[in-house]
Structures are given as structure tokens and as C-alpha cells.
């Protein structure tokens, strides 16, 4: 049994003497503890000591000077960055590498966007194709304008766009500025997208529709694709946008149904997204409807196939597949880097199921320009009221031509791999 020695203190202890009293009592307890069990006191003293720094630990357990002299140190290094440099499996696959953005067209687009205070999903979402899309010839260069600011009210686990519950209100001059910028570039096809604005009563539907109208007023020849949110499931707002003069209505499923709750914001559901695409088609049957899926989250083939069936059941015309790329360490990890041959498989499968067009590849994104030339031809023919049978035949011929070009690109990617 431990004995306790009582330290007699004055009855009246004032101010700073209280701390002295507590210290004396502590020393008394320590002394009695030492007399009873010296090993316990040693343990307490070890805990009280300052813990060694990480650097000190690494110096003690890491390579010694002799290890560096003999060359053994290189086998003892555990630095993750060093391991990644030396391990090919820890690095990005060769087919996911892109060139540094450059060129006159690239800098011209960037300058105009800054001058007119416009945001693009190309920059905000760190798209790997920015150099290709912005750096093309004037008639080919494309920028996906992100409307209603650069801050989203949702926080999906794959997206690097800034989030805030109460972002700044939309710029009332944005529709006019956007139309002005696009008319300057002399584009034939433009993509408009938007952050989710759950803070707005209409989800921003009227702002988007106004922007499309302004663009058509300034440059009626330009084809407009609008990649919208789900308007919190308000299908009337989806119909407002679909009834504007746009040509392609796009809304992304992002992933398969089973993974949606783990990847997208809780306010975005798989069935809700399907309803938005269906409502747009019903409001304007002549619209081309489009969606996009990212692969690499751990989805199965059966899940992807079921998603394609769900899209065909609502008459979705276009689907794209791309590789999920982790924007930062705070976002969801990549489960798998899908090979180019697997992307080719899903493209063929989608076309077999009756999709009008499918762009599928590691670097393909929902607004990637690869399919725009084909979609342009489809829209123009629909505008001129070409017969359905003749239209389908032309579409098939154009699609086969485009597929042959993509096959050449895939073959090159495989060769690089």
C-alpha cells in the first residue's frame, strides 16, 4: 500500500503562495511514490520529457554516415516522393500526360476572359485538355464558360470548384459580356456550364436562358450547348432552359447509381438527374440531350451497362466517358486508371445501344471538343428538316468517319503505352 506524507502548510495562503503549496504537495506525493514503487516514477518522468522531433527520430533510425559511404542508403530511403519517382506503377500512366498549355490562341482567350470577368470550367476544374481546346485555330478553339460565378453551393468529392453556402449574387451583366466574348472569338460551337446555385429560387435557370438568348442575338450562327445543374429537381426550371434557343442540353450523371451517394453531393441523386434529362427532351424533342460519366471510381461493368440502359430509356442522344483524375489530396482517391482499350470498348457498346454519338477516352471530358463537329452536323440537318431515314443514314456515315479517326488516335495511345 502506498503511504502518503502530509505536508503542513500555513492556514492562510494568499495569491502566489497557492501555487507554491500545490508544488510542495506534488513533490511530497512524488517522494512517497518513489519510496513505494521507483519504476512508476521513472515512467512518469519519461512521459514528462519533451518528445523527440520527427527529424530526430529519422536521424536515429535512418541511414548512418557509413551507409551513405557504402551506398546502402539508397535502399533505405522511404520518402514517398522518391519512391514514386522510381516506381513506374506509382506514376500516372503515359496516356494521361498532356502538353503544357501555350500558343497565341490560348493567351488570346485567357486575356478576353480576364477582361470581361468571366470564369471557365477549364481553369476552375483543372481540365487536362485546356491546352488543346484553347490552343487550337480560331475556328476550332473552344472555352467552356462557367456562368453565375466560380463558387458552387455543393461539394462533390470529385470536383475542385470552390464551395460556399451563400456565394455572391450572379452578375446581371454576365449574359451580355458572355455574348460579347463569344462573338469576338468567331466560334462555331460554344459550351456554357454553371455552378450549382441552390441559393437562388430558380437555380439560375432564367439567367442561363437569358445568356443563350443574348448569344443567339449577337451571333445566330453559333451552336450553343448548355451543361446545367439539376435545379434541385425542379423540372419546370429544366423546361425553362430547354425552351430557350439552345441546341444541346447537357446534364451529367457523373457516375453509376450505386456510387452516386458516395461521390456526389447529397442533394444530387441519380434518379433526379435522369428526370432532368427526360424533362428537357419532353419540353423540346428536337434538342440533342447529352450526359457524361467518369470512370475509375471502382464501378463495375454491369453498373455501367445498367446506366447506359437507363439513359437510352429516356432517349438521351450523346454520352461521354472519361477518366476521373483526383484534383487534390482532399478529394476522392482514384481506384483504377482505365486503359484506352477499355474506353474503346464502352464507346462501341454505347453505339451498339443506339446512342447518336459517344466520345470515350482517358482525357475526354463532358465538354471536350472531340464530338462537336459531329454534333454540329446533326443539329444543322435537324434545322433543315431532313427526313428521319436520310438523316440517320448521314449520321451513321459521319459517325463512322469520326470513329475511324478516333481509332487511329487510340492506336497511337496504345503504342505510347
Curated annotation (Swiss-Prot):
Gene3D superfamilies, per the entry: Aldolase class I
Keyword Iron annotated: yes
Keywords for the protein's UniProt record, in alphabetical order: 4Fe-4S, Iron, Iron-sulfur, Metal-binding, Mitochondrion, S-adenosyl-L-methionine, Transferase
Positions bound to [4Fe-4S] cluster 2: 152, 156, 159
Record's catalysed reaction(s): [[Fe-S] cluster scaffold protein carrying a second [4Fe-4S](2+) cluster] + N(6)-octanoyl-L-lysyl-[protein] + 2 oxidized [2Fe-2S]-[ferredoxin] + 2 S-adenosyl-L-methionine + 4 H(+) = [[Fe-S] cluster scaffold protein] + N(6)-[(R)-dihydrolipoyl]-L-lysyl-[protein] + 4 Fe(3+) + 2 hydrogen sulfide + 2 5'-deoxyadenosine + 2 L-methionine + 2 reduced [2Fe-2S]-[ferredoxin]
UniProt feature, compositional bias: Basic residues: 44-53
Binding site for [4Fe-4S] cluster 1: 122, 127, 133, 367
Cofactor dependence: [4Fe-4S] cluster
Molecular function terms, GO-annotated: 4 iron, 4 sulfur cluster binding; lipoate synthase activity; metal ion binding
Domain Radical SAM core: 137-356
Region Disordered, residue ranges: 35-56, 389-417
SMART domains attached to this UniProt entry: Elp3
Pathway where it operates: Protein modification; protein lipoylation via endogenous pathway; protein N(6)-(lipoyl)lysine from octanoyl-[acyl-carrier-protein]: step 2/2
The EC number(s) this enzyme carries: 2.8.1.8
InterPro entries: Aldolase_TIM, Elp3/MiaA/NifB-like_rSAM, LIAS_N, Lipoyl_synth, rSAM
CC terms in the record's Gene Ontology section: mitochondrion
PANTHER family xrefs: LIPOYL SYNTHASE, LIPOYL SYNTHASE, MITOCHONDRIAL
The protein's name: Lipoyl synthase, mitochondrial
Amino acid at each position: 500500500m502506498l503511504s502518503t506524507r502530509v505536508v503542513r502548510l500555513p492556514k492562510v495562503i494568499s495569491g502566489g503562495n497557492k501555487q507554491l503549496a500545490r508544488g510542495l504537495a506534488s513533490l511530497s506525493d512524488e517522494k512517497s511514490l518513489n519510496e513505494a514503487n521507483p519504476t512508476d516514477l521513472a515512467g512518469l518522468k519519461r512521459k514528462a520529457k519533451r518528445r523527440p522531433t520527427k527529424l530526430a527520430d529519422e536521424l536515429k533510425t535512418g541511414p548512418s554516415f557509413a551507409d551513405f559511404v557504402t551506398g546502402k542508403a539508397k535502399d533505405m530511403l522511404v520518402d514517398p516522393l522518391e519512391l514514386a519517382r522510381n516506381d513506374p506503377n506509382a506514376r500516372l500512366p503515359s496516356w494521361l500526360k498532356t502538353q503544357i498549355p501555350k500558343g497565341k490562341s490560348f493567351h488570346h482567350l485567357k486575356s478576353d476572359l480576364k477582361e470581361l470577368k468571366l470564369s471557365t470550367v477549364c481553369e476552375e476544374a483543372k481540365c487536362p485538355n485546356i491546352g488543346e481546346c484553347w490552343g487550337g485555330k480560331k475556328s476550332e478553339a473552344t472555352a467552356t464558360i462557367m456562368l453565375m460565378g466560380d463558387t458552387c453551393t455543393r461539394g462533390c468529392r470529385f470536383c475542385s470548384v470552390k464551395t460556399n453556402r451563400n456565394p455572391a449574387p450572379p452578375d446581371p451583366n454576365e449574359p451580355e459580356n458572355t455574348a460579347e466574348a463569344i462573338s469576338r472569338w468567331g466560334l462555331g460551337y460554344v459550351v456554357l456550364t454553371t455552378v450549382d446555385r441552390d441559393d437562388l429560387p430558380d437555380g439560375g435557370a432564367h439567367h442561363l436562358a437569358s445568356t443563350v438568348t443574348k448569344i443567339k442575338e449577337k451571333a445566330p450562327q453559333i451552336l450553343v450547348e448548355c451543361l446545367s445543374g439539376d435545379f434541385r429537381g425542379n423540372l419546370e426550371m429544366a423546361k425553362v432552359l430547354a425552351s430557350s434557343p439552345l441546341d444541346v442540353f447537357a446534364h451529367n450523371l457523373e457516375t453509376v447509381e450505386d456510387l452516386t451517394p458516395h461521390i456526389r453531393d447529397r442533394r444530387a441523386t441519380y434518379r433526379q438527374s435522369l428526370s432532368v434529362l427526360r424533362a428537357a427532351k419532353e419540353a423540346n424533342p428536337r434538342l440533342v440531350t447529352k450526359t457524361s460519366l467518369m470512370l475509375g471510381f471502382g464501378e463495375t461493368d454491369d453498373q455501367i451497362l445498367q446506366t447506359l440502359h437507363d439513359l437510352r430509356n429516356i432517349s438521351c442522344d450523346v454520352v461521354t466517358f472519361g477518366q476521373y483524375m483526383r484534383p487534390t489530396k482532399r478529394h476522392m482517391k482514384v481506384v483504377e486508371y482505365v486503359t484506352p482499350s477499355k474506353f474503346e470498348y464502352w464507346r462501341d457498346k454505347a453505339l451498339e445501344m443506339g446512342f447518336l454519338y459517344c466520345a470515350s477516352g482517358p482525357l475526354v471530358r463532358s465538354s471536350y471538343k472531340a464530338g462537336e463537329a459531329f454534333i454540329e452536323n446533326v443539329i444543322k440537318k435537324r434545322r433543315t428538316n431532313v427526313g428521319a431515314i436520310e438523316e440517320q443514314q448521314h449520321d451513321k456515315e459521319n459517325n463512322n468517319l469520326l470513329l475511324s479517326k478516333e481509332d487511329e488516335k487510340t492506336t497511337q495511345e496504345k503504342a505510347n503505352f
